[in-house]
From Swiss-Prot:
Binds 2 magnesium ions per subunit. The active site is at H100, D103. This is Xylose isomerase. The lineage of its organism: Bacteria, Bacillati, Bacillota, Clostridia, Thermoanaerobacterales. Mg(2+) 2 binds at E267, H270, D306, D308. One of its GO terms (molecular function) is xylose isomerase activity. One of its GO terms (biological process) is D-xylose metabolic process. InterPro entries: Xyl_isomerase-like_sf, Xyl_isomerase-like_TIM-brl, Xylose_isom_bac, Xylose_isomerase. It catalyses: alpha-D-xylose = alpha-D-xylulofuranose. It comes from the Bacteria. Homotetramer. The gene is xylA. Its cofactor is Mg(2+).
Amino acid sequence: MEYFKNVPQIKYEGPKSNNPYAFKFYNPDEIIDGKPLKEHLRFSVAYWHTFTANGTDPFGAPTMQRPWDHFTDPMDIAKARVEAAFELFEKLDVPFFCFHDRDIAPEGETLRETNKNLDTIVAMIKDYLKTSKTKVLWGTANLFSNPRFVHGAATSCNADVFAYAAAQVKKALEITKELGGQNYVFWGGREGYETLLNTDMELELDNLARFLHMAVEYAQEIGFEGQFLIEPKPKEPTKHQYDFDAASVHAFLKKYDLDKYFKLNIEANHATLAGHDFQHELRYARINNILGSIDANMGDMLLGWDTDQYPTDIRMTTLAMYEVIKMGGFNKGGLNFDAKVRRASFEPEDLFLGHIAGMDAFAKGFKVAYKLVKDGVFDRFIEERYKSYREGIGAEIVSGKANFKTLEEYALNNPKIENKSGKQELLESILNQYLFSE
């Protein structure tokens, strides 16, 4: 069955094209710095937003019109979604997809029944993977939707829930390995608290670390060689989540001796909710060698929740890809579109239009960022700005030779301090030149 009959194969037609079903800036085979653009960007489709989201919000009923809606049996719906997914993957020519365990198969009455459902759908996906160019970027477990996780999963006050969550992640790791997933993600949507009045924060954090160590041990036991990733988010659905931002997660990993096993999956809209620029989170992760992958989306700056919009801001995508290029590119990670069409964009074709918009925006952003890095635009200015640390007293500070006594002596004998302008306006103007030069 063809699910998207009105959508042709999406091809690159260039920036002058008026075809809505064509890429304007993303030419997957364009060679930049010795490899195709598709290998630089490593695009991925998010199974949950694309195939399971129905448009429900706190104020209204589902709006999405999907070709598989006529099925009533949950397993029939799951099978139809797999068929539709690989049709979309093929028409977009996207190299990867990501999934939660509960995205691909429905939950049963018992854990055994749920695992049986998963096995059925995983076998179906494996058959498609044999002939598809699309592979699995990462898998994960949904430890937040079911009411059993009302108090958390690994941080639940109920040990029975901790055990169930462990069993669920065990299975999710197995199927991610079985499907050839290159990464495995942990996102703690319920790992946090609503009030400290009823919370043993120390025990919860210790238990979260115990849980993650168990995951590492089991992954090693089954031979899963994918990269473990943690996705920071400060709030929503929980008031205060323990994986607040990149720095919070980094401190947690360091404290519990997990930093050698984990990197971060940074999401743009989560950075917004934490009060950071997307680039800030990427920069922090990059300079600490923990940037693993990216959830590509954007938020609405006027709203205080996770809107998960398709990323269309070229300035944002440029600065994001600047950090990726400075890192040396992705290893096992990629750009996963953790984005959903708006509730009023309910037609099946909108799924393609959203991905095309995001893929074009990141392709354009990559090309601009590559020029910025190659031309050393910001590097030269930053090098000049901090040159005082390459000579004299600055060099002594950096080398560790200076101390408070020697610095006091220097300050007493150097009463005149001369600062120079930070030239922010100039640099922003130069960035605009690069953004709009083509």
